[in-house]
Amino acid sequence: MRRAAAAAVTVTTTTRMAAEGMSTAAAAAEATATAAPAAGSRWGRAWPSALRWIPTSTDRIIAAEKRLLSIVKTGYVQEQVNIGSSPPGSKVRWFRSSSDEPRFINTVTFDSEENAPTLVMVHGYGASQGFFFRNFDALASRFRVIAIDQLGWGGSSRPDFTCKSTEETEAWFIDSFEEWRKAKNLSNFILLGHSFGGYVAAKYALQHPEHVQHLILVGPAGFSSETEHSSEWLTKFRATWKGMLVNHLWESNFTPQRIVRGLGPWGPGLVQRYTSARFGSHSTGELLTEQESTLLTDYIYHTLAAKASGELCLKHIFSFGAFVRKPLLQSASDWKVPTTFIYGQQDWMNYQGAQQARKEMKVPCEIIRVPQGGHFVFIDNPSGFHSAVFHACRKFLSGDGEEGLSLPEGLTSA
């Protein structure tokens, strides 16, 4: 029975987290963008989309998502999960505000076999759940797959970002995810997070280990810290005019998405050039088809150009140079959930940080490297990525935990 499951260290590193190589463009156009009718405003909605400076809206995000997911053969249910407006004890300002406006988490749940283990997938910075479009069919054959847009990204609600500290910013993502879990009535699930989503997933598992059966971190942020050498380099760089400019942009919370908005109707062209380069000429693995490239480009544009919200976490989570302010390495000894790290062999995220964390962990931990894959290994080498996930979850898939103990061919252990 099937069910519809309802430099070395510079700001360049952060730009790669947001769009992994998106070209820099003049941000002066941002001033023009703010003067034009916003896509989400009442005045903006009255304009035909073709005449808006930023031609997007929440409806267009969801429409682009549906077009992208039309590639997926497995049936699914898309829903906006209401997470309320004021979870008790939250550290986030908007949760404590007088506004009773509910918040929603955009969620897609794929058809699965009865009693299949639940796999929850969390996207990275500047991305959304649709980035996993090449993985849903294969993973849904073994799991009950649920993918979400984190609060402030994709088709989820985009509240004004009022966080003023690292603690409050982490709570923005962790508390909203916990409210989503309650609304979905999930108790035991496998949690997979990519890049910044891996950071959020790990922080969530540290606070709520009772709900997470296994943690899969794909090229996660948060496992590197500022070394003495890089600190010296940054000090010297800040003293230059370029360093002062970059530092000013960082402290102003300038994000790559602002470039896309600032370009207005020319933004889609920039995104198209990025997609063609990252998943085409510069790809380390399986190239996108023409259809995939067109649909993914359209989807990425609408998710990046929409109202700034979750993206503004940047300076509170990362210090200048893209080092996390609260490295997960500091919490490795407190880990309570068995963990698997997955890295593409060409991933610019350093897997040595995971090796260092493993030494401190008191729970089972393995590190798998997938060939022909970069930071978006699940797009670059889908079959290799699926093999790594199935291997990581062999205990839940085989029933007795004894089958498939050897690493699948092509994968390597670090």
Curated annotation (Swiss-Prot):
SUPFAM superfamilies, sorted: alpha/beta-Hydrolases
GO molecular function terms listed in the Swiss-Prot or TrEMBL record: 1-acylglycerol-3-phosphate O-acyltransferase activity; carboxylic ester hydrolase activity; lysophosphatidic acid acyltransferase activity; phospholipase A2 activity
Domain AB hydrolase-1 positions: 117-382
Main location: cytoplasm
Intervals of motif GXSXG: 193-197
Motif (HXXXXD motif) on chain: 375-380
Catalysed reaction equations from the record: a 1-acyl-sn-glycero-3-phosphate + an acyl-CoA = a 1,2-diacyl-sn-glycero-3-phosphate + CoA
Domain notes: The HXXXXD motif is essential for acyltransferase activity and may constitute the binding site for the phosphate moiety of the glycerol-3-phosphate.
Similarity field: Belongs to the peptidase S33 family. ABHD4/ABHD5 subfamily.
PANTHER family recorded: PUMMELIG, ISOFORM A (PTHR42886:SF29), RE40534P-RELATED (PTHR42886)
Known role: Lysophosphatidic acid acyltransferase which functions in phosphatidic acid biosynthesis. May regulate neutral lipid accumulation and participate in the regulation of lipid turnover in vegetative cells. May possess additional triacylglycerol lipase and phospholipase A2 activities in vitro.
Protein's name according to its UniProt entry: Probable 1-acylglycerol-3-phosphate O-acyltransferase
Organism: Oryza sativa subsp. japonica
Lineage: Eukaryota, Viridiplantae, Streptophyta, Embryophyta, Tracheophyta
